[in-house]
Amino acid sequence: RVVLAPQSVIDGLPLMIANNTIRPFEAGTTQNVLGITFTAVPAYNIRPEAQRYHPRSRGDIGVVMDVDGTRVYFSGDSEGTPEMLALENIDTAVVAMNLPFTMGVEAAAEAVATFSPRVIIPYHYRSSDGFSDLNEFERILADLNPGVRVERKEWY
């Protein structure tokens, strides 16, 4: 059993756990575990008012998993960062959209339209004032990039 985690997470774990099967996994690095390639993508807030949640300096990550040529991206808590927008050949993206911690519906649709996965699964879409409007997300995304298919899952 192997756990990949940023060093900042490992440092917060009890020593008996941290020294076991946890490998440091920082933004920009790639690791192979059991034939699956994991690439860490920086996950952070861009908006000044959101810096207290996920500043880039904290080292939070999203992950691209490559399993036999199928690429799946998990955004983590992030806005549409340059690193996210530069992703290529993503088959399925699992992207968070909940203000104030990540992105709103419009920003999420713009980010997804830019890196253009085949399928997008919205998650973590509860906001402080209820739920993000998934219908609006789908409408905006369809206008920007009709080639991306939205799959809704029961997240909450």
Describe the function of each predicted region.
Residues 1-2, 15-20, 68-69, 88-91, ...:
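Short glycine/proline-enriched coil/turn segments at helix->beta-strand junctions
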Residues 13-17, 32-37, 50-51, 102-109, ...:
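Short, charged, surface-exposed secondary-structure boundary motifs
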Residues 2-6, 32, 41, 61-115, 123-131, ...:
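Metallo-beta-lactamase
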Residues 1-37:
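Active-site HxH/HxHxD metal-binding segment of metal-dependent hydrolases
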Residues 17-29, 109, 113, 118-156:
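Binuclear metal-ion centers of metallo-dependent hydrolases, dominated by the metallo-beta-lactamase
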